[in-house]
Amino acid sequence: MTHYIQGQWHAGKGHDVASINPANAQTIWTGKTATAEQVNAAVDAARAAQFDWFMLGFDARLAIVEAYRSQLEANKAELAETIAQETGKPQWETATEVGAMIGKIALSAAAYNKRTGTEANDTPAGRAVIRHKPHGVVAVFGPYNFPGHLPNGHIVPALLAGNTVIFKPSELTPKVAELMVSLWDKAGLPAGVLNLVQGEVDTGKALASHPQLDGLFFTGSSRTGHFLHQQYAGHPGKILALEMGGNNPLIIKGVQDIKAAVHDILQSAYISSGQRCTCARRLYVEQGEQGNALIAMLAAAVKQIKVGPWNAQPQPFMGSMISETAAKGMVAAQTNLQNLGGVSLVELTHLEAGTGLVSPGLIDVTAIDVLPDEEYFGPLLQLVRYSDFDQAIKLANQTRYGLSAGLLADSREDYDYFLARIRAGIVNWNKQITGASGAAPFGGVGASGNHRASAFYAADYCAYPVASVEADAVSLPATLSPGLSL
């Protein structure tokens, strides 16, 4: 049970791969990668199934997607535990992820009807009708940080629109993908409508470059996303939706309740061990006594964050990072900032060799003239002190990314000023910047995406509009155009 093609499970024909629990280094899944021939078979299966799937109609497709929702409900404990073991996230957090997967069904159905349904109006020229059709065969590339929820956010709207899908998950979370697809199978999805190919870079390249793809929906790193954008640049007929990362700023200004502000900072920077694309990476705090008090409370709170394995009791706030390699990468990022002049207020440390367990870090980088514009994808928050609000906003905008940004401030006028000037696709006020609504679009500008917002707007990139002018019969106009005679 490694690859799912044409409604059947197949062993891979490539090289051996394994999935490792990053909290204890135990192997929890093994398999073989898909070869280019198996990728071809998956695309062929999706192509063969696509028209019949579209012709079922929306209501019939929705019924099957609803059956999948029922499977998620019935298996939510197993799915949450699988996500926890494979990602290292605490059980409380993976239960929330499964809940989001379940909620995605109703939200996607509502989005389909609101954004890509059918609308007809009578005009003097005839009946004007707007309809939407699926692109055809699309690939979904999933990330490791939300291995259920994020690919689910592409797959569900794609299927509702009438597309067929080849799903290529992160090579770090194959077990979650296998379980997800098995639930689709139990839901009665017709053969070929959803196919799963597991693998690493070679598998991904074989799928992304396949000539029979009509589109690709990607969530992941900016580096990979930019590579895909270059690859698709000469193919205007293919739809490409990119959701990438961010170097996200959070500004604090004039907040009286500093304990509440510290809570929102912790939730913004350290949830999921800092492995959310919307996590705060840069924190801007005013110079002065109030700012000093906030930083002192923040540093103390960061030191108290509980870190532990996914199944620890009592449950930790932070689990493991995705791998030991990722953990070591965060230590290296911190060292780089220290060498540039940063001063660690709370040092990030690798807690246990062979695992992805790290403690959270807080580093004052005010003395660094030019901060590296990098997405350090982990629990390391960079602190900058500022003297005036315009300076803070200017510094916040000094990034090639533009995913999320936030302001904690008691003044509505300050928020309006900030909202008008900040450059990001998600802008929150007095809320953690990792909080996003599935009933709203999700996406960014700059290096964070290619203007294909997901979540509620995923329906937009899953279908294309068809405009028609229609009449029940051919009819001769009352007056012919000049120069015509009949």
UniProtKB/Swiss-Prot annotation:
Q: Which domain of life is it from?
A: Bacteria
Q: Which PROSITE patterns match?
A: ALDEHYDE_DEHYDR_CYS, ALDEHYDE_DEHYDR_GLU
Which is an annotated Pfam family here?
Answer: Aldedh
Single annotated GO MF = succinylglutamate-semialdehyde dehydrogenase activity
Q: Which UniProt keywords apply?
A: Arginine metabolism, NAD, Oxidoreductase
Location of the active site = E243, C277
Signal peptide residue numbers: none
- InterPro entries (alphabetical): Ald_DH/histidinol_DH, Ald_DH_C, Ald_DH_CS_CYS, Ald_DH_CS_GLU, Ald_DH_N, Aldehyde_DH_dom, SuccinylGlu_semiald_DH_AstD
The record's annotation in SUPFAM superfamilies points to: ALDH-like
The pathway to which it is assigned is:
Amino-acid degradation; L-arginine degradation via AST pathway; L-glutamate and succinate from L-arginine: step 4/5
Reactions catalysed, semicolon-separated, are: N-succinyl-L-glutamate 5-semialdehyde + NAD(+) + H2O = N-succinyl-L-glutamate + NADH + 2 H(+)
Per UniProt, the enzyme's principal EC class comes to oxidoreductase
Entry's Gene Ontology BP terms: arginine catabolic process to glutamate; arginine catabolic process to succinate
Binding-site positions, NAD(+): G220, S221, S222, R223, T224, G225
Any idea of its EC number?
A: 1.2.1.71
* Primary role: Catalyzes the NAD-dependent reduction of succinylglutamate semialdehyde into succinylglutamate.
- Which HAMAP family does this entry report, sorted A to Z? Aldedh_AstD
Q: Would you identify the family this protein belongs to, as annotated?
A: Belongs to the aldehyde dehydrogenase family. AstD subfamily.
Q: Write down what this protein is called.
A: N-succinylglutamate 5-semialdehyde dehydrogenase
